[in-house]
Amino acid sequence: MSKVYDWFEERLEIQAIADDITSKYVPPHVNIFYCLGGITLTCFLVQVATGFAMTFYYRPTVTEAFSSVQYIMTEANFGWLIRSVHRWSASMMVLMMILHVFRVYLTGGFKKPRELTWVTGVVLAVLTASFGVTGYSLPWDQIGYWAVKIVTGVPDAIPVIGSPLVELLRGSASVGQSTLTRFYSLHTFVLPLLTAVFMLMHFPMIRKQGISGPL
């Protein structure tokens, strides 16, 4: 086993990487509230795992979406647990994200030289809210349907571009299959990809600049 480790160590310098990670200085003022960002990340990873598991059974059509969710909850092995964990961690992710934003703002973590870290964090907060909006519609029950209809109808109040924007969101003049397809694509592909990209920008900046000091 040591020979295998030595082989990788010679090529990747694993020990140097581990030393860099474990030797990072942590300021003495750091408390449990500085863990909110990490908890949000953990919730996101749980979302990815449980969401991926549900894609094996979920059918993104207006005629089968609700019945496929019922199948997950009543027939699929541990489906009820997987979907419940997905819902609980979604709520927890939104809550932790909100608390994390407040903590950073109240402790001045957005100030120079951490402006870009703050900007990427705000983008991640918007993406988190977008996960909630798109995921809420996927069961395609009465609550999901009317939530989508209301949310996609909001831009209609914007002069000139309002109506085209509504049609872009819905995929047609009214809420239907095109809308569900778009929301499913956003929820399972576009938003996770964008979130991963901005996380890969957010975390190295935190790593480079360190945790902000006390006020």
Curated annotation (Swiss-Prot):
The gene is petB. Keywords: Chloroplast, Electron transport, Heme, Iron, Membrane, Metal-binding, Photosynthesis, Plastid, Thylakoid, Transmembrane, Transmembrane helix, Transport. This is Cytochrome b6. Heme c binds at residue 35. The chain crosses the membrane at residues 32-52, 90-110, 116-136, 186-206. Heme b 1 binds at residues 100, 202. Belongs to the cytochrome b family. PetB subfamily. Component of the cytochrome b6-f complex, which mediates electron transfer between photosystem II (PSII) and photosystem I (PSI), cyclic electron flow around PSI, and state transitions. InterPro entries: Cyt_b/b6_N (IPR005797), Cyt_B6_PetB (IPR023530), Cytb/b6-like_sf (IPR027387), Cytochrome_b_N_euk/bac (IPR048259), Di-haem_cyt_TM (IPR016174). GO terms for molecular function: electron transporter, transferring electrons within cytochrome b6/f complex of photosystem II activity; metal ion binding; oxidoreductase activity. The 4 large subunits of the cytochrome b6-f complex are cytochrome b6, subunit IV (17 kDa polypeptide, PetD), cytochrome f and the Rieske protein, while the 4 small subunits are PetG, PetL, PetM and PetN. The complex functions as a dimer. It is a multi-pass membrane protein. Its cofactor is heme b; heme c. It is found in: Plastid, Chloroplast thylakoid membrane. PROSITE patterns: CYTB_NTER (PS51002). The keyword Ligase does not apply. PANTHER family: CYTOCHROME B (PTHR19271:SF16). Heme b 2 binds at residues 86, 187. It holds the Pfam family Cytochrome_B. It comes from Agrostis stolonifera (Creeping bentgrass). One of its GO terms (cellular component) is chloroplast thylakoid membrane.
